[in-house]
Amino acid sequence: MGKVVGIDLGTTNSVVAVMEGGKPVVIANAEGMRTTPSVVGFSKDGERVVGQMARRQTVLNPQNTFFAVKRYIGRRYNELSPESKRVPYTIRKDEVGNIKVACPRLNKEFSAEEISAMVLKKLADDASAYLGSAVTGAVITVPAYFNDSQRQATRDAGRIAGLEVLRILNEPTAASLAYGLDRGDTETILVFDLGGGTFDVSILEVGDGVFEVKATSGDTQLGGNDFDKKIVDWLAEQFLETEGVDLRRDRQALQRLMEAAEKAKIELSAVSITDINLPFITATEDGPKHLETRLTRSQFEGLCVDLLGRVRNPVKRALKDAGLRPDDIEEVVLVGGSTRMPMVKQLVRDLIGIEPSENVNPDEVVAMGAAIQAGILAGEFKDVLLLDVTPLSLGLEAIGGVMKKLIPRNTTIPVRRSDIFSTSENNQNSVEIHVVQGEREMAGDNKSLGRFKLYGIPPAPRGIPQIQVAFDIDANGILQVTALDRTTGREQSITIQGASTLSESEVNRMIQEAQKYADVDRERKERVEKRTRSEALILQGERQLREVALEFGMQFARNRRQRIDNISRELKESLKENDDRGIDQAYADLQDALYELNREVRQYYAEDEDDDLFATIKDIFVGDKDKERDLPRDSYRERDAYNNRDYGRDYGRDYGRDSRPSYDNSRPPRKSPRPSYQDNWDDDDDWL
């Protein structure tokens, strides 16, 4: 069985962690970073890039670079606000009302699940490289306030990425696992999770291995990106007033504004004033235009007053649902990078009355909690009990369009609830079950999760047939609905997949496409690595030829050196023509030729050492009357090594050797110290 990891699939950044030695460990990605930007892009040649590489191309390639797609996962196009649609890439509605992002580079449209799957695949591959074995399973976290469609969509993203999703875990609950795993005393904590695109607040009782969620609340459309957009609008309005140009209408300028806004937001968490300079942001008939301004922390906080109000309400609602007062909260755990903003920390102090805990890394704690949950499922932890809740009420549409609630919000899961319903008309032979989720009294004002019909009801007056409808929520928070005609025993059930999620056939198609992409990516990576190895070998060969020529002269191993030079030219030509077979053949030939040259050099030195040994024996028994050995070596180097070699040694004397190989009928002098010509393709110099 493959490895199982915990993944925090974030709006802005994602993190992967694994259990090692009973402790959660965050895994660095291939670029060496502990967080991976949740960004997917397609370069000018159609190559897919994920993470930091994709983020680097956002300004130059905004239409083919996709970020913050977590805000669209599991949602319908008509549910989006105008603010949510204001991104540099194109968002469209498909034939059933789902959200698609357009990729002009490939002339193709992707669902949010597919883009998220590419991020998950990147995280899983990096984790596999770290662990040394394939990652096949994952615990993936979602905002606590995600509805059923969004949870299903996240699970589908994991399947498309080739992962077995063992559990969908709420982010605040995951954070509480990482925070309270080793704590013995029971305490009431509030997890305040403000990420890049979502906001959650959960109240839990933690202690002695029990993690019980008392209440949860939040806003899936509120996060750090909204704070960034306040700065974007402020900058754009200033520029519009002074230059008469709305930068938000230019995709590239909008992307630069968004990056500058995020940078300014981060800086204002540490300083009270920041400079924003964007040269050549646009051009008019008068020439290029630059954006230069200053933003103070107080100005920024003034821009975000309404957002702070949206943060305040879920906290109050969670306290009310849990039946607690602020004084009952013993610890506040901050999760998400946006909680670093001073105004957010101050808001928490004002609401709860205590200083937030600084004991956890807000960027990594959720992934670490997911890894702990993976360890629980694998049996690594025996005495841990996790009791989560459903964030929103679940019910169905009854007569008159009202919502009949079967499972109220903040009900501990897993849970099963049922109720008896009947027909609204005489001789009605079928009933439609319309499942909704939300807190409004009318079904039409809530989120529609799906519809299905129960057929074959015997004719009877209205109100006589008895239809039992049961709601089952599993530990992942995913709903299954069953309708049973108690008269006939006929049953119909459905795992809710609302119109905003993918059908099974679509998921299977995307899995196949993801595998095709994986194969293409692997082949492209192999070609790049092959080219890099070949270029390094060519440079190694050229360097070695120069050193051999300088050390032994131009006549030493002349034929071998000429062959190496010819093969190097062949390899360069194959690289230029992208001839894979030619590259493979020339690479192997060049390796063999360099090996033979190295062998000849080593053989020469071995024989020269024999000469030194016999000369020493001669000196011991005969003496060195001519003092020729006292001559400086520099005098030898000034001579032509291949004409009348006289090195102060009697080469006519037999020292017991039967034969000596000839190297082009000449023997160059040996230099000291002896250089090493062992093949070492990992030397840093090989890559210069």
UniProtKB/Swiss-Prot annotation:
GO molecular function terms noted in the UniProt entry: ATP binding; ATP-dependent protein folding chaperone; unfolded protein binding
Biased composition (Basic and acidic residues): 630-661
Phosphothreonine modified-residue sites: 198
Gene3D superfamilies: 3.30.420.40, Actin, Chain A, domain 4, Substrate Binding Domain Of DNAk, Chain A, domain 1
UniProt induction comment: By stress conditions e.g. heat shock.
Keywords for this protein: ATP-binding, Chaperone, Nucleotide-binding, Phosphoprotein, Stress response
Region (Disordered) location: 630-688
Annotated function: Acts as a chaperone.
Xref: NCBIfam families: PRK00290.1 (NF001413), PRK05183.1 (NF003520), PRK13410.1 (NF009946), prok_dnaK (TIGR02350)
Family: Belongs to the heat shock protein 70 family.
Full protein name: Chaperone protein dnaK1
Organism name: Nostoc sp. (strain PCC 7120 / SAG 25.82 / UTEX 2576)
Classification of source organism: Bacteria, Bacillati, Cyanobacteriota, Cyanophyceae, Nostocales
